[in-house]
């Protein structure tokens, strides 16, 4: 597939390489791209259409929702439930699964998404994004249950994100087909392939972590960051740079483009809240881990490969360390050493 091809043509070509593929998969990815285009327009207009600021509501995690959190969730529901390509939907912004109303046609797939990741940045005009994961729906199920969504990350058919920044970029990882980047050409409203078969450098001198939590970190994380901060004079023998955007989509996109490691590890503060991590497994950690692994990187909790975690709840949380493979493996080794 050549640079400059449209997302639609790429999907059609990719589907030919998938066993038991039908037009539903193409249709579903087209539905997602339509939703992302609409969200890109809302993000771009911001206060011009009254989209900035907080809504008078909280999501299931107890987090105050931004106006755009609510609106983008509605955009996804409208775009994804009209054409019969999915059987159900899970969103960060909804307590329970979204079941299609009768007599809607049910598709072969289930969608899990964070409609607007990093929304705390929206009021200050910092990049935000959409994250999505696609898994197969159980055969013969009229209305899927929450348990049907609880599949290992390795079972994802595809995953991706859309970054709303200076340009709008859709990154897609179809299982076994690598990672591709598509840039929205606003002149004619199409996502165009601009980078194909993206690979993350194995080594890096950049890390992204919220250092304000340093006093709460576990020893393996403390050791790793301490070594990085010692630079050339320390055991690593090289200087490192720190990055932190507080938007997972922006962090992962930077890593895909030039390498790095992103960390939101388990720490004492998170444990005190009775949580297993900060980021959501099913619609943040799993899809991003599939993307990173298909680009040659690694993704772990520090103790276990993320894609092999056994999920127990659609809003379950997990620690996340992902990015350049050699650094991720080093951090995992530090956890093993204790």
Curated annotation (Swiss-Prot):
Binds 2 magnesium ions per subunit. Mg(2+) 1 binds at residues 92, 114, 116. GO terms for biological process: fructose 1,6-bisphosphate metabolic process; fructose 6-phosphate metabolic process; fructose metabolic process; gluconeogenesis; sucrose biosynthetic process. Its main location: cytoplasm. It catalyses: beta-D-fructose 1,6-bisphosphate + H2O = beta-D-fructose 6-phosphate + phosphate. GO terms for cellular component: cytosol. This is Fructose-1,6-bisphosphatase class 1. The gene is fbp.
